[in-house]
Structures are given as structure tokens and as C-alpha cells.
């Protein structure tokens, strides 16, 4: 007999001993759509990167220069937004549906205000950013344009991320997955016409003139921005029109409450700080890589895209772990929270171990998807094979952190990530890059990910992450 997350939460609140097969079924029900979403989204990102990569290594390097800055800004905003979805999961687990809808409404106001402010900041700094990062003069114009256009779409990016996470908190992983896939398909379509100029193509033996704007890197940014605008609007439309515990049409207040603000500060501030710490370290790493030449910059950027083949499953399971643990904590069932955490973490490690093998075996072919530059392919394949050994422990850190965040332990996650990234990866990269180049940077990354996974497993085993309890 199948069981939904809502039914499982009701049984947890009643104190029932839920069989392991039911918890595993719910975990798989939430994980599989999220994993499939990550697979499709990653495939679309591969196509997206390949469309830019075939313009040339300089185009790829232009985006690679500012990619860590997009991670920094987006990561901080995503951390704050995640605090709202964690509250929703715990309130639904406690059967406090009106409180959950109140949090949703407050998140909408937050997204609008903070998203517009962040967009203005990003556009305002885009002119100077590539220079601050040490980019070659020839790369700066395209890098600035890409960052400015991407920043302008931040309100929609925040909306899609926040509302999709809230839908998953209700046990619906399919709808946000479909929205994400549709958004990625739109991204490819928009990029096809915006990146390339008008050209002749042969389709089924017929010569056709295909229209295009030929905007190159700025066209890639605009295509992504337009797709995100559609995705964010669709996610909001689902919450407006579809019946369910989070339906905005149901009774609820639009007032900002002290409890919600307290919880956002308690959970969201450490999450934002964590993302800032990780992403700012990435900015410094890009600064290190930018001094290694255009080939290294392109190989590093495309290598990161190729590696996402491995960790996409981990992040899919992390989404499920956050919702499951959040509802278990809300239902005051520490035993179920632990079960979900270990079950999901084991799934993440196992799947990422398998994809790590694939990454090692097919590294040259993966790099060949993105670029035809032989030097970039050779260097990228070499560093990917180093990274493949870290994938199981990377999976442990991804899913375990999602479990802890679902319980409200964002401070613990922040400290572990800070120590690992700044104490291990950056230190080793500074020491190894001058002698070993990009290979040294990725050796540092591999060592750090293994360390991070061990730290998260140790904290999860000690159980102190559950002491945070349910939110106010």
C-alpha cells in the first residue's frame, strides 16, 4: 500500500511506529522526481554550456570569470529563502497549516523586496566586477554583460527556488520538477535564437535559413533570464490556483510576524552566511585560476559543469531529506528524523559513488560535449578524474546538510562548511596552484570534499543537530 508524506506525518503525530518500508517508500517518492529533475536540468545545462563553448574558449572564460560571483549572490539569497521552506515543512509536520500559509505569504513579500534590491546591486556592480576578479581585458565586456543580465532576473530566480521548495515540503516533488525541466527547455530554445546569428541549416535534407540575433554571451544570459521569469511565474501560479495546504486563496494573514522574522534570522542567517563563505571562497579560487591562463579558466569552468553529472543526484535527495526531516521534527518525532536522515544520506552516498565511476571513465567525452578545444578537453578530463574519488563523501555532506537544515541546525552546517572550505580547500589551493597549476587546485578540492563529508557524518552520528527542536 502506497503512503503519502501527508499520511505519514499524521501517523507520526499520533506516535505510531512507522515501518521502515513506508519511510523508504516516501523517501523514494520524494527523491526520484527530484533526482530526475536534476538529471534533466543538468543535461540542459550541458547543452547550454556547449552552445556557449562552441563560440570559443574566450566566451566560456567570460562566463567562468563571473560564475563564482553568481554563486555568491544567489547562494546568499537562496540561504535566506530556504529558511521559509524549512518553516513550512515543520509547520506542516505539526499540522499548523494556517501558520504555514502565513510563512508562504511573508516569503512572497520578502522575495519581492530583497529580489529587487539584489538585482539593483548586481546590475550596479557588473561594470567593475570582472576587473576586480582579475579578468583579462578582452574578457571584461562579455563578463560584465552576462552578470548584469543575470542579476536583473534575480527576483524570478528567487521566486522559482522558494516556491518549488515549498511545494516539495508538502510532499509534491513532481510539480516543481516539471517546472524546472520546462524552464530549462525554454532556456535552450531562447539561447538557440539569441546566441547564434542568422544562418543556413540543413534539416531533413532541406536547406533552411534560421533567424538569430547573434548576441553571443549576452544572448546566453538573456535566454536564461527569460526562462527563469517564466519558471518563477509558473511556480507562483501553482500556489495561487491549485488547492492544497499552501493554497494562497485559503484564509491567512499577510502581516509580517515576529515569529517568522525570528525563525528567518535563526535559520536563514547562518544559511546565508554559509553560502557566502562557500561562494566567496569560490571567488578567491577563481582569482587563483584566472592567473593560470585562458585554457585553465575554460577547463575549470567546464569541468565544474561536467562534475554536476555526479552531484545532481545528491542535491535531488537533499531536497527530499530537508522536507522529510522537517516534517518529522515538526511532528516531534526525533526517531523518525534520524531514520530519514540516515536513509537519505546512504542513498546519496551510494548513487554518487556510482556516478563517480562514470565521471572517471567518461571524463574526456564529457569535456568534449562542451568544447572542441583539445587543450581544454585534456586538462578538464585530468582534473575530473581527480575529483571522481571524492564523490561519495561529497554526497554524504550534501544530504546530511539537508537533513540538519530540515531540523533547523543551520549554524552547525555553516561552521562545518566554513572550516572545511577555508581551512582545507583554500589553504591547499594557494600552496599547490603555483607548482601544479589547475591540477593542484582540483587536488585541493578533492581533499576538502572528503574532509567535509567526514565532518558531516560525525556530527550526524553524534545527534546534536536534533537539539534545535521545532520552530516557534
Provide a role label for each language-model segment.
Residues 1-34, 88-155, 186, 202-269, ...:
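Short alpha-helical transmembrane segments in multi-pass integral membrane proteins
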Residues 18-50, 54-55, 68-87, 112-119, ...:
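N-terminal transmembrane alpha-helices
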Residues 29-48, 149, 160, 227-231, ...:
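Transmembrane helical elements of multi-pass membrane transporters/channels
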Residues 38-39, 75, 115, 119, ...:
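Residue-level hotspots within the lipid-embedded alpha helices of multi-pass solute transporters
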Residues 39-61, 130-137, 193-198, 207, ...:
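Helix-terminus/linker motif at the lipid-water interface of multi-pass membrane proteins
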Residues 46-50, 128, 162-166, 188-193, ...:
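Alpha-helical transmembrane segments of multipass membrane proteins
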Residues 51-71, 137-145, 217-222, 259-267, ...:
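Interfacial/gating helices of multi-pass transporter permease domains
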Residues 60-120, 157-176, 286, 299-363, ...:
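Small-residue-rich hydrophobic transmembrane alpha-helices
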Amino acid at each position: 500500500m502506497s503512503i503519502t508524506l501527508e499520511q505519514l506525518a499524521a501517523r507520526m503525530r499520533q506516535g505510531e511506529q512507522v515501518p521502515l518500508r513506508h519511510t523508504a517508500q516516501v523517501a523514494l517518492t520524494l527523491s526520484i522526481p527530484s533526482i530526475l529533475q536534476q538529471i534533466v536540468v543538468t543535461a540542459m545545462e550541458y547543452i547550454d554550456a556547449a552552445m556557449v563553448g562552441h563560440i570559443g574558449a574566450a566566451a566560456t572564460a567570460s562566463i567562468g570569470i563571473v560564475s563564482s560571483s553568481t554563486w555568491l549572490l544567489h547562494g546568499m539569497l537562496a540561504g535566506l529563502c530556504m529558511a521559509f521552506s524549512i518553516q513550512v515543512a515543520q509547520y506542516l509536520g505539526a499540522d499548523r497549516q494556517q501558520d504555514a500559509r502565513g510563512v508562504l505569504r511573508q516569503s512572497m513579500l520578502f522575495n519581492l523586496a530583497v529580489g529587487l534590491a539584489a538585482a539593483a546591486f548586481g546590475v550596479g556592480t557588473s561594470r567593475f566586477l570582472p576587473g576586480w576578479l582579475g579578468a583579462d581585458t578582452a574578457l571584461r565586456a562579455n563578463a560584465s554583460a552576462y552578470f548584469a543580465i543575470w542579476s536583473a532576473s534575480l527576483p524570478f530566480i528567487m521566486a522559482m527556488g522558494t516556491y518549488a521548495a515549498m511545494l516539495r515540503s508538502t510532499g509534491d516533488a513532481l510539480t516543481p520538477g516539471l517546472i524546472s525541466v520546462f524552464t530549462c527547455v525554454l532556456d535552450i530554445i531562447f539561447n538557440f535564437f539569441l546566441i547564434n546569428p542568422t544562418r543556413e541549416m540543413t534539416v531533413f535534407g532541406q536547406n533552411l535559413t534560421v533567424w538569430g540575433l547573434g548576441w553571443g554571451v549576452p544572448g546566453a544570459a538573456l535566454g536564461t533570464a527569460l526562462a527563469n521569469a517564466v519558471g518563477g511565474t509558473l511556480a507562483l501560479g501553482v500556489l495561487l490556483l491549485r488547492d492544497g495546504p499552501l493554497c494562497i486563496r485559503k484564509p491567512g494573514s499577510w502581516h509580517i510576524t515576529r515569529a517568522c522574522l525570528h525563525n528567518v534570522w535563526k535559520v536563514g542567517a547562518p544559511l546565508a552566511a554559509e553560502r557566502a563563505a562557500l561562494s566567496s571562497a569560490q571567488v578567491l579560487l577563481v582569482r587563483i585560476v584566472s592567473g593560470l591562463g585562458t585554457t585553465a579558466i575554460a577547463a575549470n569552468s567546464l569541468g565544474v559543469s561536467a562534475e554536476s553529472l555526479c552531484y545532481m543526484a545528491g542535491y535531488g535527495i537533499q531536497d527530499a531529506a530537508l522536507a522529510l526531516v522537517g516534517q518529522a521534527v515538526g511532528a516531534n518525532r526525533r526517531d523518525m528524523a534520524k531514520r530519514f536522515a540516515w536513509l537519505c544520506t546512504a542513498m546519496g552516498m551510494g548513487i554518487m559513488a556510482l556516478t563517480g565511476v562514470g565521471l572517471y571513465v567518461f571524463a574526456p567525452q564529457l569535456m568534449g560535449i562542451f568544447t572542441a578545444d583539445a587543450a581544454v578537453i585534456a586538462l578538464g578530463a585530468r582534473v575530473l578524474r581527480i575529483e571522481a574519488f571524492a564523490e561519495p563523501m561529497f554526497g554524504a555532506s550534501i544530504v546530511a546538510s539537508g537533513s540538519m537544515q530540515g531540523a533547523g541546525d543551520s549554524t552547525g552546517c555553516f561552521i562545518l562548511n566554513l572550516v572545511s572550505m577555508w581551512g582545507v580547500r583554500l589553504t591547499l589551493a594557494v600552496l599547490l596552484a603555483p607548482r601544479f597549476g589547475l591540477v593542484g587546485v582540483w587536488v585541493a578540492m578533492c581533499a576538502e570534499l572528503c574532509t567535509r563529508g567526514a565532518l558531516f557524518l560525525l556530527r550526524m552520528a553524534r545527534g546534536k543537530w536534533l537539539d534545535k527542536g521545532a520552530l516557534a
